[in-house]
């Protein structure tokens, strides 16, 4: 599933980005979004 993190949650490494939901660890009720374009870019956003 695609995800966007430019305005949905605290940025971990870089923003804005569009990518896919990753199974990485974020706080409860949040999900990790990993960028399409670079492995090191990801962020946490609130689950919808």
Swiss-Prot record:
Q: Which family does it belong to?
A: Belongs to the sea anemone sodium channel inhibitory toxin family. Type II subfamily.
Q: List locations, semicolon-separated.
A: Secreted; Nematocyst
Is the keyword Lipid metabolism in the record? no
- State the protein's name: Delta-stichotoxin-She1a
Q: In its UniProt record, which GO terms are filed under biological process?
A: regulation of signal transduction
UniProt KW keywords: Disulfide bond, Ion channel impairing toxin, Nematocyst, Neurotoxin, Secreted, Toxin, Voltage-gated sodium channel impairing toxin
Functional description taken from the UniProt entry: Binds specifically to voltage-gated sodium channels (Nav), thereby delaying their inactivation during signal transduction. Is highly toxic to crabs (by intrahemocoelic injection), but without effect upon mice (by intraperitoneal injection).
What Pfam families does the record point to?
Answer: Toxin_4 (PF00706)
Disulphide bridges: 3-43, 5-33, 26-44
